Amino acid sequence: RRGSSCVSSVAERMHVKQFAKTYLDHGWKIVPLAPKSKRVTKAGWIGLEFTVEDFRDGDNIGLRSVDGLVFVDLDSPECVAFANDFLPTTPSVYGRPSKPRSKRIFKSTIPKTIAYKDSDKTTLIEIRSNHQDMAPPSIHPSGEGLAWEADLGHPAEVDAAILTRCVKLCATAAVIARHYAPPGGRHDWTLALAGTLRRRGVSEDEAILLVQTAGHWSRDDKLPDRMREVSSTYAHSEDDDEPYTGATRLKELSTGGMAETLTKLWGAAPASTSAYVLNSRGIPDARSVANITLALERLG
């Protein structure tokens, strides 16, 4: 069943021991959880191996993200909505009625959990590794039942760098959507946003998808203008006399620490001397007003 598969009554749920056997047969490691809880019932569980007989009626069950199994946890509603645009496809997907398809399993070599957060410290999306995640047929603390979107399948195998970048792009789209500029101020804001992304190694196609996805979420009725603004930024040469705007300008135009969050996500813009005015020794002239302006623009 698809679509409505997350909506199931307790009577429809397979016995937890049946699920435990299925997971073990699939080569996945399991852990008993307290009923209607994410809490592991056994102390020292990280060093233990569990079997079907370790589960009691009513227990929840966790799947361990070990042996190359990696979970992507979509925490925010934006990331739940945007995941199909940014994440690789995998057949191993589950969720609950209020957060369908919010857990996606991959095979990769990411050694530890990475959480991507907004400026208010709320988690947007996580790559979870060497941990455990509550899995079907568990009952979430909210009372909702977890269910697979379809058959378990075999998780898609994805290179660690590719999966990490895809998750980072999804988090970036969520940040942009959460702090999308109000009507009347979107032109300069988009130019500065595009410059911020470009200087941090985001490609033009990625930047267009980011702004397009966040713009749809924010009901921007002038998305074609936004796309042109992004493309115009990427059309600039780094040697242009008038450099395109970036994080410094974005800080002035955005709210909620958006520019700072993007800088934390992607890192500071790499230094480059190609557009600076050089002195007689062939190094950037520290007294040049143009150089000072460009340096400030590239700081963010």
Task: Indicate where each model-derived feature is located.
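Short, mixed-charge aromatic SLiMs
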Residues: 212-227
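N-terminal nucleic-acid engagement/recognition segments and initiation subdomains in replication
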Residues: 2-10, 193-194, 200, 204-210, ...
